[in-house]
């Protein structure tokens, strides 16, 4: 216990020293183009401009090494705003509780398509922007897009669809779709109904995963390790995903 106490004290000293050093670090110099693109007052009702501006700020922060970690929520799970520019006046939370309404489901699809397009803008900017070593920033950046729910109508939090990009300079390899359900012995596959829609068996996967060993925390553990964190555990992780 004494060793644990001394370790905690030393870690606190290191964090304090790092914070003190940061106070004396001069602000980075940025180009006029970057300043004009990011120094904007944009209302959230202009969702596209708002999303892209925040993504641009994240790219600029990574490029100038102001920070190496950033999180951007497109809106709270309960109050994600509407997107009037594509004809959506409802919040995403409202659309997710669609009750099978075809109009709501179409808007929900359009909402998610719009959101992933803005994430695509972020990846493009990372690809176009050079890091301090003159290499594309995307190579040293890991970008994870997703949600803690796979089916909002019933608050299903399993079988999460995630997009993981970047980090090739960190040894990551992409260009594949990894379906962890297929690794489960009793997984019978995905089935479509007569109308081409997914059956109720699919939606059950959103609450009861076929592969109970597939944890999102396994991916977060991989990301932490590739960032140099010396740890063998992240939350309820049980292995490191091989990518």
Regions found by a protein language model. Give the residues of each.
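Ligand-binding pockets and gating/stacking loops
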Residues: 1-243
